[in-house]
Design a protein with these regions (language model features):
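Elongated, amphipathic alpha-helical interaction scaffolds
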Residues: 1-152
């Protein structure tokens, strides 16, 4: 009888992360992962993968390449990033990345009521943020833009 060789793929590598969460054949894994993060606050039933490379309006603008970029069935956008190396300004980078799907929602040259679909940036970090704003005892942090007095988006 032939022995089955076991193979593992590391989610901490760019290849492994994109292979598991960024391919249509594994879409169910991404949906399950997103739903586990939302913990019932929202239910993701389906996603469509989008082009992860974004460039600015002119060639001199900064570009962004997301690990995984997709759209939910209600028009919400999901950016999912795996970051191994420490980056001092990762919060700023995450906010910068979020501007691309926000800007995509603004049609050029037509009337627009400025209604925006939700944009979620999910970052799996293999390092500590080392900031006072984050509880060092927790491994998961939920951060959002909100009205401070009511803690409401």
């Amino acid at each position: 009888m032939k022995q089955v060789e076991e193979r593992y793929i590391s989610l901490l590598t760019d290849f492994g992360f994109k292979r598991i969460f960024g391919t249509a054949m594994n879409k169910d894994l991404l949906i399950c992962f997103l739903n586990s993060l939302f913990n019932g606050r929202q239910v993701v039933k389906d996603v469509s993968y989008l082009n992860p490379e974004h460039v600015g309006d002119v060639y001199t603008d900064r570009r962004a390449i997301f690990d995984v970029y997709c759209e939910g069935e209600n028009g919400e956008k999901f950016i999912v990033e795996m970051q191994n190396a420490y980056q001092t300004y990762f919060k700023d980078r995450a906010l910068f990345y979020s501007t691309f799907p926000i800007r995509e929602q603004a049609p050029k040259g037509s009337d627009w009521d400025f209604k925006l679909n939700h944009v979620y940036t999910i970052a799996l970090l293999n390092f500590s943020m080392n900031e006072d704003a984050f509880d060092k005892e927790k491994i998961r942090h939920h951060v959002q833009l909100c009205e401070i007095g009511r803690a409401h988006v």
